[in-house]
């Protein structure tokens, strides 16, 4: 629903360990259809890496994985903005994982972002180039030297874009609501804990989306009255990734 590749999930499948970031855990269930919802921000390079890692399990990925056309895409320059911004804070860093997540959500709320539905249009690269130029101006303003190669990031990015385009890109909110109305069971999987919620977490040391159970509504397009059972996992102490 608001999955990003910040938090990894390690699973033991057929006596082997496998890590997922973007793709739902249900991909290993032969009877399930998996949907990457509209609330997710997708890193095409990470997505491609995960898809390649799943090939050894002989899963029919094309029929089992659907992607929302409304999900936003993490661009190479989002990662450089993230790293440059964090470096400019000195001792006041917020603990970013430097994956470009925050800057992607900034473009989403600023109505500048590129969504999965955009990449099937023939002129989407024009939009990409315009946004890239804006990002480069912002990166220059930080005046920081970060160890990231834009050329390398773009090569991985465009390869991942082609992988995403090979899957079924859908109006996921329509698909999910039709499934609910037809009596199908929907399991929504969140990525992060409540203390990382943008509104109710330990702000500003939080992520950029709503990670509580209510996020299923906005992250999947499911109405509140359709949510029946909520399961939370508690642990005795707080853990964080990055320097947070």
Q: How should each PLM-predicted stretch be described?
A:
Residues 7, 16-31:
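Non-catalytic, usually N-terminal nucleic-acid engagement modules in DNA/RNA processing proteins
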Residues 158, 165-211, 220:
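Acidic catalytic cores of enzymes that act on phosphate-bearing nucleotides/polynucleotides
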Residues 1-13:
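Single conserved hydrophobic/aromatic residue that forms the stacking wall/gate
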Residues 10, 14, 77-82, 109-111, ...:
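Short acidic, glycine/serine/threonine-rich loops at helix termini
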